[in-house]
Amino acid sequence: MQDVINSEKLKFDAEVGKVLKLVIHSLYTNKDIFLRELVSNASDACDKLRYESLSNQDLIDQDSDFKIVISVDQDKNRLYISDNGIGMNRQDLIDNLGTIAHSGTQRFLDEINNGTSSQGVVELIGKFGVGFYSAFMVASEVIVESRKAGESIGYQWKSHGDGEFTISQLEDNQISRGTKITLILKPEESEFTDRFRIEHIITTYSYHINYPVYFLNDKGEEEKLNSDAAIWTKSKGEISAEEHQNFFRTVAHVGGEPWMILHNKNEGVVEYTNLLYIPSIKPFDLFHPDRKCSVKLYVNKVFITEDNVQIIPQYLRFLKGIIDSSDLPLNISRETLQNNKIIEKIKQSIVNRVLSELKKKAESDIKDYKKFWENFGSVLKEGLCESMNTEFREELMSACRFYSTYSDDSLISLEDYIERMKAGQDNIYYLTGNDLDSVKKSPQLEGFISRGIEVILLVDPVDDFWTNVVTDYQKVPLKSVIRADEDLEKLAHLDKSEEIKENEDESVDSKEKVDTFVKYAAQVLDKLVSSVRVSKKLTNSPVCLAVADGSMDIRMERFLREQKQLNYKSTKILEINPKHPIVTKMIDEHANAGESVTLENMLHLLLNQACILEGEELQDVSDFAERMNNILAKVYQ
């Protein structure tokens, strides 16, 4: 280590202290991970300089052979990791090692505090860029010496991980470009000075990073520990399952094994290679708005970026891996990537291939596909919401799988649904809800189930959005059962139950009583509903809410109100089931005795029941309680 001047002691950002404690506590059985993280950071530093040097060749100082060197001093119990990458100046050291972005840190801390497993934390630290601090698991002190490319002054950062760090200027400015990390190991961690222990860790975690990793032996010779050959340049048959697993770990930052591997060399209009993985485990931050793409773009094996390039659409953000193209210029800027025609062609080709492979998998092994769908189905359906995404809409819909009233736990395709449609049925019917159990119990389904008409059950939040964008599949309209009461009337001949047919045959006298009661109900409920009508869909429940064709879906309207994007609440249609014992008794009572306070209370309570079943907030809870008490008091008189 070099002598220093102008030292300044600073305190860690408050969040760093929390991370240090939690990482060390959570990873005590996975200490190897610290070396993976430090080598990964060194590789990133080389990537950054390699990219920057494309526009400023002077930055590399005639030293363009990027590498990472690991050495040890067993007598002093020290471990060294150095690279000749971009390096850091004083402010970089403070920003990168003394603070962490608050949004990412808090999510990281939340995940650990929520009981994330030790292996889960291993994956999290790489995802959030807090892996550097894992060095304090094995080191009593960490010293970082660095000189940034293009600058002449080097700096030192050091800390015991106790809440403070010291920044100093290196007195001798002959320090090489890049970064050297010195770990003064704890006495019990001397195993990490063993050459074979280090080789095992590198082989396990860092074998396929893009730069050579060397071990500096006692003779001063550099022994290569990894294969820095780009794994994606090999043919499919040359890559073993173990190699895929190691590379997947490097690029994915999630646990488990890849669920699907997509390795293709494309030599058509645009030449590129992709090595993409779909994980078998859902990342914890899959739906976080700050989540970045995890597919890296290379040009002729030179890393360009994984940020600010829409080569992978958001609805495929579960993909991990790389795309390498020889058709893009090496000096392309991140800005010009946005509207690049070659990028757009690669994107279209990738989307096409992914959706095609997903459809094949769904058709050949639905049991295995169900695992994918439970992890990433709701993400894939986000693509249906994009109004501009009409090109792949049919392919997306073909890859989608749904639960339905046809089977309790089997997933179906829309093709399956269409094949089972009843004669005379013109629509694909669906119902949205919060969860499968509650949707299956919805009164909205009763008339469809009794007539043997299948209904698709949608329970992901995204379903409320795409069903307002997608109007049909293979020219068959999609329709919510909440709007389908008139359809059931037209499909009455499809009833499979004689009992239902008999129920639909009413005497003139009975029909008049029902019509009169419906008018009375509309008068009592007045401004609380848009209308009251006899339901064609209810068989077991007394009431339900409905909306007219062309009206906004109930759940979508509620969402927009909650997001302050809608400042009113529309009135709904109240449907009543005149065959339900409660409603039948009310109709008879009204026909025999006319209007009454009890009937008014019952109508309000039935409306409230319908609202509760649809997840609607009651307009007046006190009124609901008072009417309920009045009815209960009458029962116990």
From Swiss-Prot:
Residues 1-334 are annotated as: A. InterPro entries: HATPase_C_sf, Heat_shock_protein_90_CS, HSP90_C, Hsp90_fam, Hsp90_N, Ribosomal_Su5_D2-typ_SF. CDD domains: HATPase_Hsp90-like. Keywords: ATP-binding, Chaperone, Cytoplasm, Nucleotide-binding, Stress response. It holds the Pfam family HSP90. The keyword Cytoplasm applies. It comes from the Bacteria. One of its GO terms (molecular function) is ATP binding. Residues 335-558 are annotated as: B. One of its GO terms (cellular component) is cytoplasm. It is found in: Cytoplasm. The keyword Cytoplasm applies. SUPFAM superfamilies: ATPase domain of HSP90 chaperone/DNA topoisomerase II/histidine kinase, HSP90 C-terminal domain, Ribosomal protein S5 domain 2-like. Residues 559-637 are annotated as: C. Homodimer. NCBIfam families: PRK05218.1. Belongs to the heat shock protein 90 family. Molecular chaperone. Has ATPase activity. This is Chaperone protein HtpG. It comes from Ehrlichia chaffeensis (strain ATCC CRL-10679 / Arkansas). The gene is htpG.
